[in-house]
Amino acid sequence: MSEMEASVTIPIWQNKPHGAARSVVRRIGTNLPLKPCARASFETLPNISDLCLRDVPPVPTLADIAWIAADEEETYARVRSDTRPLRHTWKPSPLIVMQRNASVPNLRGSEERLLALKKPALPALSRTTELQDELSHLRSQIAKIVAADAASASLTPDFLSPGSSNVSSPLPCFGSSFHSTTSFVISDITEETEVEVPELPSVPLLCSASPECCKPEHKAACSSSEEDDCVSLSKASSFADMMGILKDFHRMKQSQDLNRSLLKEEDPAVLISEVLRRKFALKEEDISRKGN
């Protein structure tokens, strides 16, 4: 009886349809296979040891980020938990990060390299400080020299002024300064003018050489000679001033010409143009010789 019942038992959706009396359950059963799906099974790889499986977590965590960044190979085509090295054997190094070929860029390493390039070295800093100290020392020396020249130039017209009360003291100074200024050679002034300038004797020597000048009968002659000497001194002082001005102009012109020549020699553009000009000139000469 039970066997007959088991054989008679038929699923509802396998019965033949009977017109409009067919239920929705029968329609779903005929269209969908109502059978359980196979369970998912995981296969263990034979090459992985038990120690590696214990040490590595099955799910990647935030601790894997450093390993992913320091890995040499691409990591998008494999399972990270299978190829991650052991914690006690893995030691990241900057060389691995620089030589890796990963899709994720290492921004931290590039920033560190840029900072290292921007920081100047200690020897360069010490050298620049030494150069600055040397330049300041040279500037102070130049300032002292210029100040001494200015002081000497300001003292010379006072001694050479014709209205000075003491005539005997500035005359020897005038003789020495006059000789030094007239000995300078300028392109605008010829040597004949220097030769034609007579040497003026000092007034004390004239008075000592002629003792009769102190007598009352020679006072008029002495006064006239002193006036002539004052006029000649004023002319000589103006001539000395003009010589000093011309001397300064000549020095400035020489320094400007020297600076221009040095700038032209040191300018890289001038050197390159000169080399190119010579090169093309040689090429043109060779072409002309071949044509002839």
Curated annotation (Swiss-Prot):
Subcellular location per the Swiss-Prot or TrEMBL entry: Mitochondrion outer membrane
Post-translational modification note: Phosphorylated by AMPK. Upon stress, phosphorylation by AMPK is sufficient to induce mitochondrial fragmentation.
GO BP terms, alphabetized: aerobic respiration; mitochondrial fission
Keywords: Membrane, Mitochondrion, Mitochondrion outer membrane, Phosphoprotein
List of residues that carry Phosphoserine: 41, 103, 110, 224-225, 238, 261, 273
Membrane topology, from the record: Peripheral membrane protein
Coiled-coil stretches: none
InterPro entries to which the protein is assigned, alphabetical: Mtfr1
Primary localisation category: mitochondrion
One GO cellular component term noted in the UniProt record for this chain: mitochondrial outer membrane
One Pfam family, short name: Mito_fiss_reg
Biological role stated in the UniProt entry: Mitochondrial protein required for adaptation of miochondrial dynamics to metabolic changes. Regulates mitochondrial morphology at steady state and mediates AMPK-dependent stress-induced mitochondrial fragmentation via the control of OPA1 levels.
Record family assignment: Belongs to the MTFR1 family.
Full protein name: Mitochondrial fission regulator 1-like
Higher taxonomy: Eukaryota, Metazoa, Chordata, Craniata, Vertebrata
Originating gene: Mtfr1l
